[in-house]
């Protein structure tokens, strides 16, 4: 049977309408958590979050990436990537994501950071506005031996 280690959350914007900034080509940090992982191996980390995005342009997409071990964006630390189409609407939609990190090395604390960005990735065009809410959370457990 598995054993619970820690649960942490990070809320960047708790309401619709915030932060109210455009999605840019520069990855923007919207959540950081430091899970207390007690130097155990065989960890199961489940990461979940949601963002509110709005766009009046057809074909709008955005990307979310989760990095392990840093609060500064570094492509070498990316463990999860989501590329999402935005529904054409004058109102915002909320987009949820879930990832697991089954390869995290043993550490007293494991940091995870969530970034949202636009620009160009694989020839896709990213645009839109971050209109909230924005939240990121994670649960750490030790898997069965």
PLM regions with names:
Residues 1-145:
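Extracellular jelly-roll beta-sandwich "head" domains, especially the C-terminal globular C1q domain
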């Amino acid at each position: 049977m598995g054993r619970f280690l820690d649960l942490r959350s990070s809320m960047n914007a708790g309401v619709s309408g915030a932060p109210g900034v455009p999605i840019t080509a520069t990855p923007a940090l919207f959540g950081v958590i430091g899970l207390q992982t007690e130097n155990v191996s065989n960890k199961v980390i489940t990461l979940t979050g949601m963002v509110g995005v709005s766009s009046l342009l057809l074909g709008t997409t955005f990307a979310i990436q989760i990095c392990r071990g840093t609060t500064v964006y570094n492509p070498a630390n990316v463990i999860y990537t989501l590329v999402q189409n935005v529904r054409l609407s004058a109102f915002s939609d909320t987009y949820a994501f879930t990832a697991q990190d089954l390869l995290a090395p043993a550490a007293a604390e494991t940091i995870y950071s969530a970034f949202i960005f636009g620009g160009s990735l694989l020839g896709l065009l990213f645009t839109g506005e971050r209109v909230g809410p924005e939240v990121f959370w994670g649960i750490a457990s030790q898997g069965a031996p």
